Design a protein with these regions (language model features):
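Acidic, aromatic-enriched beta-alpha/helix-loop junctions
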Residues: 44-83
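Extracellular structured ligand-interaction cores
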Residues: 28, 39, 56
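N-terminal domain-onset segments
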Residues: 1-36, 133
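Helix-rich interaction surfaces within compact, conserved domain-sized segments
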Residues: 67-121
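Hydrophobic/aromatic-rich, well-ordered segments within soluble, folded domains that form packed cores
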Residues: 31-51
């Protein structure tokens, strides 16, 4: 499976690294990559195409341990070159909702969002859903 499509290339142009700073859990998800044989999920929110054709990507990297998962950088070439059992490769999630934010992507993947990110997200969600009587 090709990890980067023309559609993803356009999204990386729209969301270069740094473009969603400060949004935390509300950052728009561009892509989700995963290890089909076990742990390893990368939920990508930003990325830059490098001169050599590789992509530097930023997002939530979860390697099977909620306590050790973190926002960070990963290179496309690193994901493409991971040696998995049975000759399998890292795959792109074809069924991730298109207009999904980071918290929604974590929840649909079964990842527990970190408390610092979830608290801010839920506060904003509650403020967005408040009924005002005038």
């Amino acid at each position: 499976m090709k990890l980067i499509t023309k559609e993803l290339e356009k999204l990386f142009e729209k969301y270069p690294i740094g473009s969603q700073d400060g949004l935390a859990g509300k950052a728009k998800v561009i892509a989700k990559f995963f290890n089909p044989t076990g742990v390893g999920t990368w939920i990508i929110t930003e990325g830059n195409k490098l001169e050599n054709g590789d992509y530097e990507m930023f997002g939530y990297c979860h390697l099977g341990d909620d306590e050790m998962a973190e926002l960070g950088y990963v290179m496309l070439s690193e994901l493409e070159n991971l040696k998995l059992p049975f000759g399998l490769k890292v795959e792109r999630d074809l069924y991730m909702p298109k207009d999904c934010d980071l918290i929604q992507a974590m929840k649909t993947t079964g990842i527990t969002p970190p408390s610092y990110m979830l608290e801010d997200y839920e506060k904003e969600q509650n403020n967005d859903n408040m009924d005002y009587d005038y």
